[in-house]
């Protein structure tokens, strides 16, 4: 009887310990084509972008989410201050045009104030998308320095992942993100990459 009672307590304690483990309750915040952020109306309006992000994070907190997956590199450009890649046209209206704030730094600060982890989402290979053209790439885009790292499929351009130079460059992009920003994870997503 004593043994059964102690076993029952042990099992109950184990169940409670599983119940208290945090769940990943997240949402994705897409920036390509201004799907979620910033809105098309807020392109280049940085105070409006900040207000919109704060409103989103407040809503996520009310929904009891504990993480966001924020797309910071949709088309080989950056929604953060980068020395490797140009500012995103989805943020500023023109690729390479500098924003007056660092959206990723802002998101990290505001999300963490609300107990929300920040996972960054990058599309490692896509260079053009959403109707973008190679001619529209900023002068400081790596394409202009190393066109041999890229390939065209249909109307879209991509990094050529079979090249060591491409992989080395992408590793630098990731290293830059993890060393300069207070982020919890990186998600690499390229379901857009062409395949036969």
Where are these regions (language model features)?
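Sec-dependent N-terminal signal peptides
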Residues: 4-13
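Aromatic- and glycine-enriched glycan-recognition loops and surfaces
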Residues: 43-63, 90-112, 169
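Sec/Tat signal peptide C-region and signal peptidase I cleavage site
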Residues: 15-19
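Glycine-rich, aromatic-flanked loop segments that form ligand/cofactor-binding clefts
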Residues: 21-26, 65-76, 103-151, 185-190
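Aromatic-lined carbohydrate-binding/catalytic grooves of carbohydrate-active enzymes
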Residues: 63-99
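Active-site-adjacent "subsite" loops/lids of carbohydrate-active enzymes
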Residues: 30-50, 120, 125-180
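An active-site-proximal structural segment forming one wall of the substrate-binding cleft
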Residues: 56-65, 107-110, 158-191
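N-terminal structural segment of carbohydrate-active enzymes
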Residues: 20-78, 167
């Amino acid at each position: 009887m004593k043994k059964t009672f102690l076993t029952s307590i042990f099992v109950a304690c184990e169940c409670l310990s599983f119940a208290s483990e945090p769940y990943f309750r997240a949402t994705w915040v897409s920036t390509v084509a201004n799907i979620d952020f910033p809105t098309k109306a807020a392109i280049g309006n940085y105070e409006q972008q900040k207000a919109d992000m704060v409103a989103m994070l407040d809503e996520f907190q009310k929904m009891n989410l504990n993480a966001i997956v924020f797309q910071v590199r949709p088309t080989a450009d950056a929604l953060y201050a980068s020395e490797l890649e140009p500012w995103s046209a989805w943020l500023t209206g023109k690729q390479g045009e500098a924003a007056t704030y660092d959206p990723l730094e802002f998101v990290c600060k505001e999300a963490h104030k609300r107990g929300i982890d920040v996972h960054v989402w990058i599309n490692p290979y896509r260079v053009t998308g959403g109707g973008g053209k190679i001619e529209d790439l900023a002068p400081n885009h790596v394409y202009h320095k190393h066109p041999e790292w890229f390939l065209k499929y249909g109307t879209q351009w991509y990094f050529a992942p079979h090249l060591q130079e491409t992989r080395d460059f992408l590793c630098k992009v990731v290293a830059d993100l993890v060393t300069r920003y207070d982020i919890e994870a990186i998600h690499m997503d390229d379901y857009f990459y062409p395949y036969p």
